[in-house]
Design a protein with these regions (language model features):
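Multi-pass alpha-helical membrane architecture of UbiA-family
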Residues: 1-305
Length: 305
């Protein structure tokens, strides 16, 4: 019986590796890794002699910076998660004491170190991304208390900064071309809508904790319409730019991807709470596919500023 008591989860002093990995949420790493890759492709620069930068940059964007942001968010969201998702590592007790905070700090430091080793622009982008991650979750700023600010911070960090970093690193730390910057900005705006989709699963907990997510502020129907608009409008902007730049067939592909999303969005709007996950799972991939299509469209077409 004594051994049984000693080995109970409540007596654990250190988190299990599986709990740390769950805290870092590998499933969330894909968007910034993809955006970094899009930024790389948009330069049109050969990978020859630069593979180490590509690999290091992808690791920086996903398993480091994004993972750090997830740990930060879970630590400062532990009260909300105790209501919405009590099975998560911190509220469940599998991440004992202040270990959630320790992991967030350690991963932040390691991310800054890797960014510094890659290049000056990578370090600057890493610093900005991590500042947004901490300001998103940490009082007194806590951007996520307001859905407009919080979703914007995520969109900039996950898409815009990652895209910018990929372009800058591959171009030898030169400032990316104007078309690449414009695409990064537009897809960052679109990511604002994607982030809103994630808020439909936590409406009750957000209300109780005073988190002004867009579903709380605008109501379910209003937030759903806003999410669709924020996703679609930037993509139509991308379509227009590709036409101006003479990338006609890529513009046609963007239209087809938009059409597929619109079909799913019409279904989503009928019952946003139940169908947000479906749109995230099947509509968002069309959005991110458009990112790569547009990156290939501008690759090598334009010189740097």
């Amino acid at each position: 019986m004594g051994d049984a008591i000693i080995n109970t989860p409540t007596m654990r002093r250190f988190p299990a590796p599986s709990a740390i990995l769950e805290l870092l949420k590998p499933i969330t790493w894909f968007p910034p890794m993809w955006a970094f890759a899009c930024g790389v492709i948009a330069t049109g620069v050969s990978f020859e002699g630069r593979w180490h930068l590509l690999i290091a940059g992808v690791i920086l964007a996903g398993p480091m910076v994004c993972a750090a942001s997830q740990a930060v968010n879970d630590w400062f969201d532990r009260e909300v998660d105790a209501i919405n998702e009590p099975q998560r590592p911190i509220p469940s007790g599998r991440m004992p004491g202040a270990w959630g905070l320790y992991v967030a700090i350690i991963w932040t430091g390691l991310s800054l170190l890797l960014g510094w080793l890659i290049s000056p622009w990578a370090f600057v982008a890493t610093l900005l991304g991590l500042l947004l991650a901490w300001f998103y979750s940490m009082p007194p700023l806590r951007f996520k208390q307001n859905g407009w600010l919080g979703n914007a911070a995520c969109g900039i960090s996950y898409e815009g900064l990652a895209w910018f970093t990929g372009s800058a690193v591959m171009m030898g730390d030169l400032f990316p071309s104007t078309p690449s910057i414009l695409l990064a900005i537009l897809y960052s705006i679109g990511a604002h809508g994607i982030m809103t989709l994630n808020d439909f699963k936590a409406i009750e907990g957000d209300r109780q904790m005073g988190v002004l997510s867009l579903p709380v502020q605008l109501g379910v129907a209003g937030a759903a319409e806003n999410a669709c608009l924020m996703m679609l409008a930037p993509q139509f902007g991308v379509f227009g730019l590709l036409l101006i730049w003479g990338a006609y067939w890529q513009a046609g592909v963007i239209v087809l991807l938009i059409a597929g999303q619109i079909v799913m969005m019409r279904n989503f709007l009928l019952d946003p709470v139940k169908r947000a996950l479906f749109l995230s799972g099947f509509g968002v991939p069309l959005f991110v596919a458009g990112m790569m299509v547009s990156a290939f469209a501008v690759a090598g077409r334009f010189s740097v500023n």
